[in-house]
């Protein structure tokens, strides 16, 4: 992991005091996000989370824009209370709880997953196209995948005598799958939509770590949620979530099942 820069807490405290936030000191806040710096601070009647983008300033505006998009789409996310363009940090709501992965295989997961699907369908029903949001290129995705396959085959060619034919076979299969992929219109996508990037608090699901929101394959996020490589759900749970997603997105369930696998 790359070394992190130290944020200037005195400047942050002065900024907050100039905005009439009367705070004491700062507490460390553990997070899995390696490039972000979090600090917890308290006023007389509320707790606030300071999120610094000092280590990756380019994410600062992306995070603010993505937050505005989520809120406009009726997707719950921690509210930005204040921000500093100069020091590249935001002050946001703090929820005194870990991410939703702590509820995996616990009773609460039965409420969390349907709420997550509802949040996702809200995200994917944009009232307008948002300018300045990246659209993933389908051609580039295919090109990268093919290059990766060629590199793999070339590396093991001396061991795999049928390397040439294997390469051709995989290419044909990938191209056929990509032709199926091309029929989809890119939609707003979180990119890492699974329990680790959700917070369950006061019976609501909040989406976090959303600065990379972009336009991509419409089934990417629902696939990430239901078929998470780090945890698996029963066939019954998967089926219920797919039915809910299909109903809210007005999709044919049979076609959805075929496309998502």
Predicted regions and their residues:
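Short, intrinsically disordered, charge-balanced linker/junction segments flanking boundaries
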Residues: 252-261
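ATP-binding pocket architecture of kinase catalytic cores
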Residues: 30, 39-143, 154, 182-183
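Short, glycine/acidic-enriched loop or turn micro-motifs at the edges of active sites
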Residues: 85, 96, 195, 212-214, ...
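Active-site acidic catalytic loop and adjacent metal/ATP-binding pocket
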Residues: 36-42, 123, 175-220, 232-236
